Protein backbone atom coordinates (compact mmCIF):
# COMPACT_ATOMS: atom_id res chain seq x y z
CA UNK A 1 0.00 0.00 0.00
CA UNK A 2 2.84 2.41 0.84
CA UNK A 3 4.45 1.68 -2.53
CA UNK A 4 1.21 2.54 -4.33
CA UNK A 5 0.89 5.83 -2.40
CA UNK A 6 4.49 6.74 -3.22
CA UNK A 7 3.92 5.96 -6.90
CA UNK A 8 0.75 8.09 -7.01
CA UNK A 9 2.45 10.97 -5.18
CA UNK A 10 5.47 10.98 -7.50
CA UNK A 11 3.19 10.85 -10.55
CA UNK A 12 1.23 13.84 -9.28
CA UNK A 13 4.45 15.75 -8.56
CA UNK A 14 5.70 15.09 -12.09
CA UNK A 15 2.36 16.12 -13.55
CA UNK A 16 2.66 19.43 -11.71
CA UNK A 17 6.12 20.02 -13.12
CA UNK A 18 7.97 19.19 -9.91
CA UNK A 19 10.49 16.47 -9.48
CA UNK A 20 12.23 17.01 -12.83
CA UNK A 21 15.45 18.74 -13.79
CA UNK A 22 13.55 21.45 -15.69
CA UNK A 23 13.61 24.90 -14.07
CA UNK A 24 10.35 26.08 -12.52
CA UNK A 25 8.19 28.33 -14.69
CA UNK A 26 8.85 32.06 -14.30
CA UNK A 27 6.76 33.89 -11.74
CA UNK A 28 4.09 36.18 -13.15
CA UNK A 29 4.92 39.89 -13.33
CA UNK A 30 3.96 41.46 -10.00
CA UNK A 31 3.47 44.93 -11.48
CA UNK A 32 -0.12 46.07 -11.27
CA UNK A 33 -1.83 49.34 -12.05
CA UNK A 34 -2.07 51.64 -9.02
CA UNK A 35 -5.65 52.64 -9.82
CA UNK A 36 -8.69 51.62 -11.78
CA UNK A 37 -11.59 53.19 -13.65
CA UNK A 38 -15.08 52.99 -12.21
CA UNK A 39 -18.35 54.15 -13.73
CA UNK A 40 -20.44 56.69 -11.82
CA UNK A 41 -23.56 58.75 -12.57
CA UNK A 42 -21.19 61.59 -13.53
CA UNK A 43 -19.20 59.35 -15.87
CA UNK A 44 -16.02 57.29 -15.52
CA UNK A 45 -13.41 58.31 -12.96
CA UNK A 46 -10.13 57.03 -11.58
CA UNK A 47 -9.93 55.62 -8.06
CA UNK A 48 -7.01 54.17 -6.14
CA UNK A 49 -6.96 50.52 -5.10
CA UNK A 50 -8.94 51.41 -1.95
CA UNK A 51 -11.68 53.02 -4.05
CA UNK A 52 -10.76 56.60 -3.13
CA UNK A 53 -11.32 59.21 -5.84
CA UNK A 54 -8.21 60.50 -7.60
CA UNK A 55 -7.71 64.10 -8.68
CA UNK A 56 -5.65 66.18 -11.12
CA UNK A 57 -4.07 69.51 -10.14
CA UNK A 58 -4.48 72.17 -12.82
CA UNK A 59 -1.03 73.63 -12.06
CA UNK A 60 0.63 70.33 -13.03
CA UNK A 61 1.21 71.29 -16.64
CA UNK A 62 4.52 69.76 -17.66
CA UNK A 63 3.42 66.19 -17.15
CA UNK A 64 6.78 65.26 -15.67
CA UNK A 65 6.70 66.98 -12.29
CA UNK A 66 4.26 67.75 -9.52
CA UNK A 67 3.64 71.36 -8.56
CA UNK A 68 1.94 70.37 -5.31
CA UNK A 69 4.67 70.70 -2.68
CA UNK A 70 4.99 71.81 0.94
CA UNK A 71 1.66 72.94 2.39
CA UNK A 72 -0.16 71.67 -0.69
CA UNK A 73 0.71 68.07 0.23
CA UNK A 74 -0.86 68.63 3.66
CA UNK A 75 -4.18 69.09 1.87
CA UNK A 76 -3.67 66.82 -1.15
CA UNK A 77 -1.90 63.49 -0.88
CA UNK A 78 0.20 62.43 -3.88
CA UNK A 79 -0.52 58.85 -5.00
CA UNK A 80 2.86 57.53 -3.92
CA UNK A 81 4.73 54.90 -5.90
CA UNK A 82 7.48 52.55 -4.73
CA UNK A 83 11.00 53.63 -5.66
CA UNK A 84 11.27 50.70 -8.08
CA UNK A 85 7.83 51.23 -9.69
CA UNK A 86 7.60 50.95 -13.47
CA UNK A 87 4.98 52.31 -15.87
CA UNK A 88 1.91 50.11 -16.31
CA UNK A 89 -0.24 50.93 -19.35
CA UNK A 90 -1.31 54.58 -19.10
CA UNK A 91 0.03 54.83 -15.54
CA UNK A 92 3.50 56.38 -15.35
CA UNK A 93 5.86 57.19 -12.49
CA UNK A 94 7.22 60.68 -11.94
CA UNK A 95 9.80 61.96 -9.49
CA UNK A 96 8.64 64.71 -7.15
CA UNK A 97 10.79 67.70 -6.19
CA UNK A 98 11.63 66.00 -2.87
CA UNK A 99 12.90 62.90 -4.73
CA UNK A 100 9.93 60.68 -3.87
CA UNK A 101 7.99 58.86 -6.59
CA UNK A 102 4.33 59.22 -7.42
CA UNK A 103 1.90 57.80 -9.94
CA UNK A 104 0.55 59.75 -12.87
CA UNK A 105 -2.10 58.90 -15.45
CA UNK A 106 -1.02 59.77 -18.96
CA UNK A 107 1.75 61.84 -17.34
CA UNK A 108 -0.68 63.81 -15.15
CA UNK A 109 0.14 63.41 -11.42
CA UNK A 110 -2.58 61.82 -9.29
CA UNK A 111 -3.67 62.84 -5.78
CA UNK A 112 -6.26 61.94 -3.16
CA UNK A 113 -8.16 64.45 -1.05
CA UNK A 114 -8.42 64.31 2.74
CA UNK A 115 -11.94 65.74 2.30
CA UNK A 116 -12.95 62.32 0.95
CA UNK A 117 -13.67 60.01 3.88
CA UNK A 118 -15.25 57.00 2.16
CA UNK A 119 -14.53 55.21 -1.11
CA UNK A 120 -16.32 57.00 -3.93
CA UNK A 121 -16.54 60.38 -2.16
CA UNK A 122 -15.84 63.40 -4.39
CA UNK A 123 -15.63 66.14 -1.76
CA UNK A 124 -12.24 67.28 -3.03
CA UNK A 125 -13.77 68.33 -6.33
CA UNK A 126 -15.58 71.24 -4.68
CA UNK A 127 -12.67 72.64 -2.66
CA UNK A 128 -11.09 74.82 -5.37
CA UNK A 129 -11.29 75.21 -9.11
CA UNK A 130 -7.66 74.06 -9.43
CA UNK A 131 -8.51 70.44 -8.58
CA UNK A 132 -10.59 68.14 -10.75
CA UNK A 133 -11.63 64.51 -10.57
CA UNK A 134 -9.24 62.41 -12.64
CA UNK A 135 -11.12 60.96 -15.59
CA UNK A 136 -9.69 58.52 -18.12
CA UNK A 137 -10.93 60.52 -21.10
CA UNK A 138 -9.26 63.82 -20.13
Set out the residue ranges of the language-model regions.
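Compact beta-sheet-dominated domain cores in extracellular/mature segments
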Residues: 14-138
